[in-house]
Regions:
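Enzymes that bind and transform nitrogen-containing heteroaromatic metabolites
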Residues: 1-170
Length: 170
């Protein structure tokens, strides 16, 4: 099973401030949807709650695993797709393997990305040409461990960005 992170980050690796993304790039959201639709996504509880606050519902079309330290936690809403609680990364990976998943998409936040880094196979990143203030950051990437393949540079509302794929070196 491949473990794939999907992330939008600034040049300073910022991914968020106060549980929100510090930019709004519609093309990035469409790219995220294209990468994750129909696949199981793994996220932390704070990311799940941030999605609920923003969308008013869980992400549609994607079974969701929420990683939390709280054995009592349960989602307050029920989506069309299953929402599963995992108490550890190992627990989440075991559930994913038991379901026969080919890929598990890791969608944040910062603590979850940090926990998964050593096991990630691929990182699908949107690299944004800004260094916003933040309180959540994606871990640093060692070029000795990752092969970087950038796509074409684009702009949205005057903000430059590039979709980049990182694959772990063999």
């Amino acid at each position: 099973m491949r473990l794939v992170a999907v992330v939008a980050m600034g040049q300073n690796h910022c991914i968020g401030l106060d549980n929100r993304m510090p930019w709004h790039i519609p093309e990035d959201l469409a790219h995220f949807k294209e990468l994750t639709m129909g696949k199981t996504v793994l996220m932390g509880r704070k990311t799940f709650e941030s999605i609920l606050a923003t969308l008013g519902r869980p992400l549609p079309g994607r079974p969701q695993m929420v990683l939390t330290r709280s054995a009592d936690w349960a989602p307050e809403v029920v989506g069309q797709d299953p929402i599963t609680r995992a108490l550890s990364l190992e627990d989440a990976l075991e559930m994913a393997r038991a379901r026969g998943l080919d890929e598990l998409m890791v969608i944040g936040g910062a603590e979850i990305y940090a926990q998964c880094m050593a096991q990630l196979d691929v990182i699908e990143a949107t690299e944004i040409e800004a260094s916003p203030e933040g309180d959540a950051f994606f871990p640093a990437l060692d070029s000795a461990e990752w092969v970087r393949t950038p796509g074409a540079r684009s702009e949205s509302k005057g903000l430059g960005y590039t979709f980049v794929r990182y694959e772990r070196r063999a």
